[in-house]
Structure formats: structure tokens, C-alpha cells
Amino acid sequence: MMARKRTVGSVFKFDFGLGPAENSYVKIGAESSYDVSLGYGFTDVNQVYAIDREEAGRLRRDFCIPLNTAFIVDVPDGNYHVTLMVGDTLTATETTVKSGEGRLLLHRLQTAAGQFIKRSFAVHVSGGQLILAFSGIAPRVNALEIAASSQIVTVFLAGDSTVTDQEAEGYPYAGWGQMLPHCLNASAAVANHAKSGRSSKSFIDEGRLEAILQLIRPNDYLFIQFGHNDQKPDLERRTEPATTYKHFLKLYIDGARERGALPVLVTAVHRRIFDENGLIINTHGEYLQAVKELGEAEEVPVIDLADKTRKLYEAYGAERSKRLFLWSVPGEFPNHPSGSVDNTHFQERGAIEVAKLAAEGIRQAQLNPLMLFLN
């Protein structure tokens, strides 16, 4: 079946492998390199293999093995409901899927030999391309269905480097917002606007809040986590906890509410700095209390991620907690050949744990309906 350039409202159906295509599906093989005229394809076909087990069922009999490559579909910006089918009649599989700038959707999804699983999730697209990156020990993709949806709730994130989508070149660096999609079902998508190095002030001054407010819709959410860079001495970022910090945070709250969206304040995650008794030192000073006071005054839910990460780090202990952050020895990670000692930024496993804490906070704050959309 020949595909055409897609428009708003289109439904995409792809059948991967060597066998004949299922009815109404576009066949994708190992040679299906991204073609701008078609608007879909793999980024690197040298990392894709196609197999046909010649069993019953056109979607089950064959598949592609995408080894650390991505499948791209050109689409209008917006939210999409995506359903992925994976499995193999002959052997066990393990597949990880990320979208866009490394947002985790499926983590080490496993199937036994002869088992086939369908998983659905929501993806927020900006930039005109839906990108699904595949990895894993034995990844598979049998079929893929994509449909635009106006019913999906969007969780917008405003924050700093501890929240942001870290670039692939920095792997295993990751922000907790980058891992949050893994905690949500197909009814909610994450739009991560967090940016490294920003404070509550500089984020606004650069027009980043305004960019969110142009997109946010009634009943969407705006999660707001700043504090790390508000402490910095430069005038472009510096705020004072009792005054300017609260002032700028209130602009996020007011902007969301004016558009019918729901603001949520999040206290800044702690740095990994222990005292001699194995307890976390609060390096954020009065900024944490300022968030709580503002939340109470404005009747805005507060997720105390500072307290949750404190408990997490202390439970891990001073030495073991290094594995949550980008502590590495020379040669451990190709992107950091000289090693790294970083007590602020997470590596992927740490970001996943903190995203789970954020999800726990959503449930504890009874953020309805978002709490119903947690995995």
C-alpha cells in the first residue's frame, strides 16, 4: 500500500517485516529508509533487519529488528495515540522505546517466545515529526498504529536541567521530566519545555513561559520546578525566596489559570550532598519553604519532590546513591570518556526513580483526572 503525506486527522498503520502487508497497513521493511516524499521511514537502515517466521497472522508472522535506530513519521504538531505491537513466535524479546528527545515510553518491555503484546501510549509532537527510537537486547516491532487525538491531556513542564530532555549526546544524562511519560498511560502526554540553566526569572525573560501559554489548553497541567538556578548570583537568573522568586512563580500560576489549565508547584530536587551522619544537606535554603507558602496562599497543589528525593538518597546511602547521578569512571560511558563527578544531574536510572516519585506525588495530591492516567 502506497503511503501519502499526512494531514491532521490521518490514521497511520504500519506493518513491519518481510511478509505481505495486512489490509489497510503500509508495509515497512529493512530497506525502508526515511523518505521526505513519503513522510516516514527509519533513520538508519543499516541498523534494521527484517524477518518472516511464516506463521499464521500477517502482523505476527514477521517483524523488524531496529537496533538503536528510530522510525520517523511526518505529522502536524499535537498529541498522538500510539499503539505498538511486539513479539516473536520463536524467541523471547526485549524492547525499549523513546520518543522525541529521549522521552521514555516503554522500558525493557519483554515477551516470551510465542507471546505478542500491544502497548499504547501518548506522544506529544513538536517540530513536525513523531520519532520513535528503538533499543534493547532483542528489540522487535511488528506493527504500529498512530492517530491524532484531541482528547489527550498534556502535562507541560517548566523547569531546569534536572527536569529537561537531555540530549542523546550526553547519555546517560537524563531529566526526570524526560522519564515521566513512562509513568503515564495513553490518556496523557508530556510536553517538556524545561531548559538547562534556567531560573524562574530567566525562563520567562527568554519567552519560554509564553511559548507554553500559547499551546496550553483547558484541563491541561503546568508543572513548575525551579530553584537550582534562582540561587545563582548573576542578575539574569537570581531571585530572592521571599519576594521575586514567589513573584515569578505566580506568573506561571496566573498564566495557566487564565487559560483554564491546572498549575502544580514542585519543590526543587535535592543535590547529592551528605553530612557526616549520612543525611542530605539542604542547599536550597528558603526556596523550598517559599514554594510551599506560595502553594498554600494560591491554593495550588505542591509536590514536595525535595523531600521525596532526600528520602530516596538517604535510603540509598552516600556511596550507593552515586548510581542515581552521573558519577562514572573514565571509559565507562562513551559520551564521558574522562569520567564524571556530578551531584546535581541524574543519569537515566536516577531520573526514572525521580519520575516515579513525581507520579507518587500526583497520586498523593489527588490531581484528578491526572492521577487516573498513571500506570
Give residue spans per PLM region.
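Residue-level detector of flexible, active-site-proximal loop/helix-junction positions
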Residues: T111, T162, G197, H270, ...
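Short, structured coil segments at secondary-structure junctions
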Residues: S99-E101, L184-A186, R259, E298
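Conserved SGNH/GDSL esterase-like catalytic core that processes O-acyl groups on lipids
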Residues: Q151-L157, T162-G255
